[in-house]
């Protein structure tokens, strides 16, 4: 796959570029012949965070096998709990959280603080050196207001992969909270599924895994659908069979298809789900 450029807009195509001459050296030759680690983007859903030990053990196992994980996390369940404590009622439109100014303060605090650091701490305890950041750091996620009906919710307009690449180059695992920044410096809440899809596409990841609290995409009889074409996925969304929080997951997977090797929606509650999927034994839904 073509290496990711530092700045990537969702509508970008990968430009052709000429090779730049490099000085001859033993170190340069060794670096050039060393194969790049397969990069996978893993979205850990807020609904599975209370039971995320197995998923993180899978992440640690993949990392030890020479695979480079980039983690994007949600935190919806915990955000709702903290909003309830403040007497703020959570509202959703088309599976996306409505975010006003008061809600945004809680979203930013919970995602970038509590949830992010819990995940980083857990990974560190599993022997994985992880660093917690958000889409605001280094301008990783640039966004604009997605829909006035949703309030301070962002549509990603640009992904700056340079800070992520820097963390990876240092031998660390990035753990990213989905908060973005607009041109006017306003922070915006970004759906974690959307953020994961945009980051996976910008980095030309080999795989995109969405971990959630259901088996995968289900049909009208609540049976798991092992694989969906783009047309089938859109039909399920248009008919309402796939609704709620599954819609942004499917849309993110579909949008990433042109740049990502494979996209999967998996049950993050099932022990070994992530490892099985990477080894070709997925029990969720593959998109594309």
Predicted regions and their residues:
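C-terminal catalytic "cap/lid" subdomain
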Residues: 2-288
